[in-house]
Amino acid sequence: TTVYDAEGSKVDFDGSLRIIV
């Protein structure tokens, strides 16, 4: 799942709940 944080940076959430910014 890809979302964007408040600053517009892409944040990818994988199945292990790690966050890749």
From Swiss-Prot:
It is found in: Cell outer membrane. GO terms for cellular component: cell outer membrane; pore complex. One of its GO terms (molecular function) is porin activity. Disulfide bonds: none annotated. It comes from the Bacteria. Monomer. Its main location: membrane. Keywords: Cell outer membrane, Ion transport, Membrane, Porin, Transmembrane, Transmembrane beta strand, Transport. One of its GO terms (biological process) is monoatomic ion transport. It comes from Mannheimia haemolytica (Pasteurella haemolytica). This is Major outer membrane protein P44.
